[in-house]
């Protein structure tokens, strides 16, 4: 029992010291708490932000690609198409008619209708559709429309089979 009393006394003395330490530690713990809190928050936010970020990036990329890249791609496509068309025309039968018609068409439509036809036929119909349906109606709905269209389209085939 005497031993217990001694332990208690020691504990009491220690408790006082511990209390002081605890108070000091508490400050550290409080400081650590906010630091630890942002970690999971950032993690969660990162995971949640990953989706919208990807959406925004895709939208920005699409926008830039649609304005700058599309023009460049369309120019290159037209050049390739023109070269191929010209070569094929030379080998074909109505080269003169084709050449004249193409020249007149290009000059008349200022490479607008011809390009549209070429772009619509050469690459997938996704770019022209997105360009027409996405860019014209609303700029803000462009980033929200692709994911919405992608999700239902991906879910539909999964649900059907």
Swiss-Prot record:
Organism superkingdom: Eukaryota
Cell compartments where the protein resides: Membrane
Residues passing through the membrane, by range: 25-45, 55-75, 81-101
TM2 domain residues: 52-100
Topology Extracellular: residue spans: 46-54, 102-161
GO cellular component: membrane
UniProt keywords, alphabetically: Membrane, Transmembrane, Transmembrane helix
Primary localisation category: membrane
Keyword Ribonucleoprotein appears in the UniProt entry: no
Alphabetized InterPro entries for the sequence: TM2, TM2D1-3-like
Annotated membrane topology: Multi-pass membrane protein
Parts of the chain on the Cytoplasmic side: 1-24, 76-80
Residue segments, region Disordered: 139-161
Family: Belongs to the TM2 family.
Protein name: TM2 domain-containing protein DDB_G0278163
Lineage summary: Eukaryota, Amoebozoa, Evosea, Eumycetozoa, Dictyostelia
